[in-house]
Amino acid sequence: MGKEDKQHINIVVIGHVDSGKSTTTGHLIYKCGGIDQRTIEKFEKEAAELGKGSFKYAWVLDKLKSERERGITIDIALWKFQTSKYEVTVIDAPGHRDFIKNMITGTSQADCAILIIASGTGEFEAGISKDGQTREHALLAFTLGVRQLIVALNKMDTCKWSQDRYNEIVKETSNFIKKVGYNPKSVPFVPISGFNGDNMIEASTNCPWYKGWEKETKAGKSTGKTLLEAIDAIEPPVRPTDKPLRLPLQDVYKISGIGTVPVGRVETGVIKPGMVVTFAPANVTTEVKSVEMHHQQLQAGNPGDNVGFNVKNVSVKEVRRGNVAGDSKNDPPAGCDSFNAQVIVLNHPGQVGNGYAPVLDCHTAHIACKFAELLEKIDRRTGKSVEDKPKFIKSGDAAIVKMIPSKPMCVESFTDFPPLGRFAVRDMRQTVAVGVIKSVEKNTGGSGKVTKAAQKAGKK
């Protein structure tokens, strides 16, 4: 298989602040990745000048991160690495300010999460304690539908590669991920040193007692020794090409000589030239004249593609960021009057009751929504109701809530269209809650604008 033919997968790296996420991720990208020798030499030189003589992989990631935060678009190849089967993109590593928001509205759904645990004495305990970030990140990944997990026990060199310590941590972590919702049998546990490279890409000689990881899923059993092999054993995701088209708009451009060009990422389905699309909640229907990606004309835009498409007889004022395009003949998108969602409160200083109206980030939409009614409080692991019509919910609680958007908005249920069915609740400049949409009350507000181009195309 040539480099071109590898299937793409996305991973997200989670874990406590000092677990060594950057070092581990940096190491993989450095050894198997898209960073060319020149960039590495440049980084090494800078590191030496700054007295970071022990140039290690975290530096790679810190460089990339600071550039990303300063808004310098880094060649996204820098966040990629190869396994024998996959081309892997690291879609985010926490520590980034908007990590939680990115993970939810994020440009893409992670296919697998790698949970990095620090094995040092005291470190592990801190990371996994009640209020630890580890718990929040793992819960978030599970809630948002990331069903595959790999656990890397990092910094094994700090506990002298002790087998007892390894067993103790595997046992504790298994209990911990079970509480979140994962089945430990389907999770590979890999002891590593992201700093020294043990069991990252090649099997380590420091732990003769370690016989390798194994995992068992519906698809069968797989085994291996290294973290790279565990990533290679991720089950290939099925991309939703057969679902109806949903394409949330990131921007709409007016390009002279061409016209109106909406831009966004195809989440489900396929967009093709000649298709008649409906934009919701704008309720405008028109024909797609052409589709392009990276300045090349496409015959079809598939899930995951960031495309621009040219539409006729529609002005820039009529469609905007946050609108969703879909095929007018196949379950077209519509605006909603209200929706019910399972909301998990992460960190709100007070109590949340009926009438609370924060801003929701759902796909590319950014709209204030009112918590119209707290319907029931639920056990967030089982989803079973524990209290009907609670007065308030607080941090740590999960509830089914009826939400009413303050202005027209297009969302979908999580089971039908995952990327349009999860949202972040933002207030006080942070993510205070996350939600997964259970059902949507769509508005059937009459027919909107149908352009001449659409009518013509419809007659063909």
Curated annotation (Swiss-Prot):
Q: Which residues carry this modification: N6-methyllysine?
A: K3, K31, K317, K391
Indicate where the modification N,N,N-trimethylglycine is found in the sequence: G2
| Membrane-crossing segments per the record | none
* Stretches for region G1: 15-22
Cited SUPFAM superfamilies: EF-Tu/eEF-1alpha/eIF2-gamma C-terminal domain, P-loop containing nucleoside triphosphate hydrolases, Translation proteins
Grouped into one coarse class, the protein's main location is cytoplasm
Q: Does the keyword DNA-binding apply?
A: no
Alphabetized, the UniProt keywords read: Cytoplasm, Elongation factor, GTP-binding, Methylation, Nucleotide-binding, Protein biosynthesis
Q: Where is this region: G3?
A: 92-95
Q: List the GO cellular component terms.
A: cytoplasm
Q: Name one Pfam family in it.
A: GTP_EFTU_D2
Its biological purpose: This protein promotes the GTP-dependent binding of aminoacyl-tRNA to the A-site of ribosomes during protein biosynthesis.
- This chain's protein is named Elongation factor 1-alpha
Species the sequence originates in: Aspergillus oryzae (strain ATCC 42149 / RIB 40)
